[in-house]
Amino acid sequence: MKMYEILELSNLYNSISNVKLPLKTSYKFARLMKLVEGELTFYQTKFREIIEEYGVKENGEYKLTPDGQSIMIIPGKESECNVKLFELRNLDVPIEGIKFSIEELEGIDISIQELACIMSLIED
């Protein structure tokens, strides 16, 4: 599983965490999130390090892009920063021991994008 899939999995988990599911399915999701907890912490730490290295600061605060959607990157360093972020998001993360059957996921309404992030965990 790639790190970006772990991030999407975390978002899926947050969106369904209050949905009542069969015990076995809930248990598997809880175990899965426990497994990836350390990976999420690792990602957040590395992401902060990259932003610390490449982000533009003004008065001790990160400066936002004109659209206010992201942190401004040091001019001339955008490509280098993007490569590091790409590498971080594409790290391989081994997830073993947890598989879902389609039947176990039947009570969950999810989008195709959300389904894509758990496809590698589904047994046909």
Protein language model regions, located:
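Low-complexity intrinsically disordered segments
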Residues: 44-124
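N-terminal interaction modules that seed assembly of large macromolecular complexes
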Residues: 2-55
